[in-house]
């Protein structure tokens, strides 16, 4: 994963803007052509560069950027009932610090999204999540018979 504002990228932006300013002028000198060639070389070298390694704070910052509010794991989450005899687990440091990794690799370490509750489900939850004592009282009151303002338990 490349850095967002790398030196070759900044150099290309600067060179490209300067070149556009110079194009309006009909006179082109060899220094202008050399400057343009240098810019193109910087652009192609940054475009063909492989993914970089991320370690320490840079790795944590990249994970926070990619995962956002979900959070992230340093080891890949495993399923339930995984065997203790399994092979040693590799983590994000092994994959992105000791070797280079890309954006997809970083996303594999993001925590899953937590489902959000809608307003309707919250209202339904209020009714169904009454404390047990209140439910019992409510059930007792509804099970009473009514015979002329006298309440009898059935």
From Swiss-Prot:
> Its Gene Ontology molecular function terms?
growth factor activity; hormone activity; insulin-like growth factor receptor binding
Give the start-end ranges of region A.
Answer: 91-111
Basic and acidic residues composition bias: residue spans: 126-139
Where is the protein localized?
Secreted
One protein family per Pfam: Insulin
Where do the segments described as Disordered lie?
120-154
Q: Which tissues is this protein detected in according to the database?
A: Expressed in all tissues examined: brain, lung, liver, spleen, uterus, ovary, testis, heart and skeletal muscle.
Coiled-coil annotation reads none
Please provide, in alphabetical order, the Gene Ontology terms of the cellular component aspect for this entry: alphav-beta3 integrin-IGF-1-IGF1R complex; exocytic vesicle; extracellular space
Q: Where is this region: B?
A: 50-78
* Keyword Transmembrane set for record: no
Question: What family does this belong to?
Answer: Belongs to the insulin family.
Role: The insulin-like growth factors, isolated from plasma, are structurally and functionally related to insulin but have a much higher growth-promoting activity. May be a physiological regulator of [1-14C]-2-deoxy-D-glucose (2DG) transport and glycogen synthesis in osteoblasts. Stimulates glucose transport in bone-derived osteoblastic (PyMS) cells and is effective at much lower concentrations than insulin, not only regarding glycogen and DNA synthesis but also with regard to enhancing glucose uptake. May play a role in synapse maturation.
The entry's protein name is Insulin-like growth factor 1
Q: Species name for this entry?
A: Capra hircus (Goat)
Record lineage: Eukaryota, Metazoa, Chordata, Craniata, Vertebrata
